[in-house]
Amino acid sequence: MELIIVLGIMSITFMLTNTWLSTQLPHWRLNGAVRQVMSDLVAAKMNAVVERNRQRIFFQDNRHYLILDDKNNNGQIDAGEHQDVRDIQADYQDVTLTASNNPSFLPRGTASNLASIILTNSSGSKKITISITGRVKVQS
């Protein structure tokens, strides 16, 4: 009898926890994707300062973006320049991104081609903005 009561309590607890988790997962994925994109943008800014050349971010579609170490500062992808392609949906399946522009970080840490990046999923959307001073900021 005691075993049946314990199993009943455990099944109710599991059911409530499962329901709560299923509503929270999209929110956690969106926040994780925002952290991923923001950290990549800040890292590109820091690399521009350290390496003294332009770092350019190209948003290719609603899930991929490319980080270019533009050695000759021409804004184009040339042979021999390091490229790092990121797929946001590799870790955050239901998150999509849209960008208003392809930003560049200059050797002084400032930015050109200012951009707003919007990340969206079923829990909502968040916006990352890049100011002319190079500040990367998240807005809800």
Q: In which residue ranges do the predicted regions lie?
A:
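N-terminal signal-anchor/signal peptide hydrophobic helix marking the start
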Residues: 1-8
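N-terminal helix-rich module
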Residues: 12, 16-46, 50, 54-140
